[in-house]
Structures are given as structure tokens and as C-alpha cells.
Amino acid sequence: ALETIRADIQQGLERVANLDEDRILSAYVNLIEAILRTNYFQQHSPQQPERLSFKIDCAAIARMPQPRPMVEIFVFSTRVEAIHLRGGLVARGGLRWSDRPEDFRTEVLGLVKAQIVKNAVIVPVGSKGGFIVRRLADCAPNERTEEVESCYQTFIRGMLDLTDNRDHNSVIPPPRVVRYDQDDPYL
């Protein structure tokens, strides 16, 4: 079934006459094919907050600039947008609230590079995450801290939605997540 869908998409791309449109559509197809996990199928549960998370294989994205982390988790909701970049299966880093909505991914990528240099002796690869609060300007000054903390929690939950768990020596995948990668109980 998947090969049929790919063939249909390829046929559609062959009908695109404009070079820019072809590049853009091909990049979207490439991005979709690089998705390793999503929490999309968890969204239909009444207990699950509204957020969408994707784990992406950065090496599989043709147009992603260097340096490429091993994986990127992208979390999106109406209140927060977040990413977590990780250079390897075991990586050391942190999370931060960014005030740069236009280029927070660039900011986080720069922090990952610094983390790699800083931790080269301890752990050879780094990780870093960042998030922006989408509605902060709508909050009264006394509500801002609560909004930032709530968005941070949504970010963490979005990553945990995709992350395998451990029970002694067993790895337990998250419910209703189709995995196209190896076990990854990173968090």
C-alpha cells in the first residue's frame, strides 16, 4: 500500500511544471518520509491534550543544512511550538524558553553545537531543546509565568508521547505510536 501511495505522489510530482513548486512539494514529501514517529494517533483520546509531535530523522532530509542532529522532535500546539535536537542515542543538554519566534530553531541549533564542544570529553554528542510561547503577548503580566510553565509542560509531554519507556530490561513503546526507528528510551 505504501509503495502505491509513493508511486501516486511521484506521478503527481511529474505533472508539476514550475521548478520552485516541484522543489517545495518534493521537500514536503521528503520531510514526511523522514518522520520516524508521531503522536497523531494518540490525539483521539479524551485524556490527551491537544498537541502534535513528530520525531524526524534529520539525516534523511535532503535539504537540511549541516550540521544535522541525529533526530529532531517537533512539538506543536496552539500555545507552544518546540523542538528538541539530539546528536546521538546518548546526548547531554538542556531545554530553554526562547524569545526568538522567527528563528528559535537556529538558536537551538547553535546551542547544540556549543553543547557538543562543551561536553566532548563527557558525552561526544549534545542535545538541546527550545520552545516559544505563542500567546505570551495575550497574557496579563501576572499570568505570564503560569503560561510559560504550562507551555514547558506541554513541550515535555509532547516529547514523552514519542519516547519509549523502560521496565527493568524491557523497552515499552508508547501506546498508539507507529515506530519506524529502533528502541529509543532516551528521556
What would you call each of these model-derived segments?
Residues 1-187:
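Extended, well-ordered protein cores
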